């Protein structure tokens, strides 16, 4: 009987060891899967946070001397090759080529047009009167024809936008701490406008005049 008990005990120990080994393998696999899933989720979260931290802002560019939201004519060029997309068609232009249109340009403005650069550079608006004779704009440009006139929107990352707002609102000769404070205020204000836009009727978050905060008047 003693031998029988010992044999049963050994068998139970072996079975228990096998179950323990099998469970350990399953747990290891589950832990590895959970770790991989967590790493993927973390990467996606970081990407979303980076995007959320520097979202695109849409700026309605007013006409000469900020007189109106509408333009009678628009002339656009760039210091790099650029393209114009709209109406299911795409046009390509070389650096320095100008695209000009007015309210009478019906064949060209049957719908919205989007201007994008094919490499890093800036768009230039030689017709527009600002502090400089030919103001430059990063990002993309959006042109739309309405009954009242042409509207022009500049879309670019928020942080890039702020680089053009701060020197437009405050001289660069001011103390650095004052400039930092201005940047913080400008960012908070811009993000508030992005959440509760008064320019939504134009498809923009705000405009470039003193009605909001002056943009790219340097």
Question: What do these predicted ranges mean?
Answer:
Residues 1-218:
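Conserved, single-site charged/polar hotspot
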């Amino acid at each position: 009987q003693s031998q029988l008990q010992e044999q049963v005990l050994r068998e139970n120990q072996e079975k228990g060891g096998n179950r323990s080994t099998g469970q350990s393998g399953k747990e290891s696999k589950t832990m590895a899967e959970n770790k991989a899933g967590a790493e993927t989720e973390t990467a996606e979260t970081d990407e979303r946070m980076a995007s959320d931290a520097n979202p695109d802002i849409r700026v309605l560019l007013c006409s000469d001397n900020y007189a109106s939201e509408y333009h009678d004519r628009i002339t656009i060029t760039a210091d790099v090759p650029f393209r114009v997309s709209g109406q299911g068609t795409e046009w390509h232009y070389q650096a320095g080529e100008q695209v000009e249109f007015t309210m009478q340009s019906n064949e060209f403005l049957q719908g919205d047009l989007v201007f994008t650069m094919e490499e890093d550079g800036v768009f230039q608006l030689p017709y527009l009167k600002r502090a400089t004779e030919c103001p430059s704009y990063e990002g993309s440009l959006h042109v739309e024809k309405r009954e009242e006139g042409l509207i022009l929107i500049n879309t670019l990352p928020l942080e890039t936008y702020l680089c053009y707002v701060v020197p437009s609102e405050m001289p660069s000769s001011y103390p650095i701490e004052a400039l930092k404070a201005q940047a913080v205020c400008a960012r908070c204000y811009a993000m508030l406008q992005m959440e509760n836009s008064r320019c939504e009727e134009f498809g923009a978050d705000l405009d470039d005049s003193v009605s909001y905060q002056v943009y790219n008047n340097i």
